[in-house]
Amino acid sequence: MIKKLQTSLIALVVSVFGFFSVPLSTASAADCSVHIGDFDWDSANIHTAIGAYILENGYGCDVQVTKGSTNPILAALIDNQIDIIFEHWTDNNVQLIDPELESGNLVFLGVNTPASEQAFFVDRATSEKYNITSVEDLAKPEIAMLFKDPENPEKGRLTSCISGWTCYTINLVKLKEYGLDDL
């Protein structure tokens, strides 16, 4: 647990990237070994690469990175096989993450991209021209036809997450709940 806490504290400092233009420690790799979990999307890869670089070059840590899909990496983190992840979309795994946070097994260190949201978006010009102000407006047939599905022109099409990602499944449920699954 102490090692996990030390790693968590290092990660907190690492998140303030601007401070690390020169090495801040004379610690050797023997003093610091960190196993980072990385995911299969670009922004996570960037965050992991920056964090790994800082830990290796700024702290002299021995860094191992394991890349994989969300569920296996989270399972390894929860099982203490991985020390830290630098990006996670917690809304997609609330049932898995919240109990681990509550038990103290995982520590949330902060948000690295505060403006990131998961939502349905329409550009301003289209929104203003057709008075689209909420997701419910997308259920109107005349609005749905603005976003025709080229494979089925009788229906509208929304762009979602990559098939296989948790957010894809979440969005399927949302579409059904909003009454958008048959449009």
Predicted regions and their residues:
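Short, well-ordered beta-strand elements
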Residues: A30-S43, C61-T66, E154-T159
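A conserved helix-loop-strand patch within extracytoplasmic ligand-binding domains
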Residues: N105-S160
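Bacterial N-terminal signal peptides
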Residues: S8-V22
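Ligand-binding cleft/hinge of the Venus flytrap
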Residues: G51-Y59, D137, E142-L183
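Positively charged n-region of N-terminal signal peptides that target proteins for export
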Residues: M1-L5
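Short helix-initiation/N-cap motifs at beta->coil->alpha
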Residues: W41-D42, D62-A76, D182-L183
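Pocket-flanking alpha-helical
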Residues: T48, G68-G104
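Sec/Tat signal peptide C-region and signal peptidase I cleavage site
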Residues: V22-A29
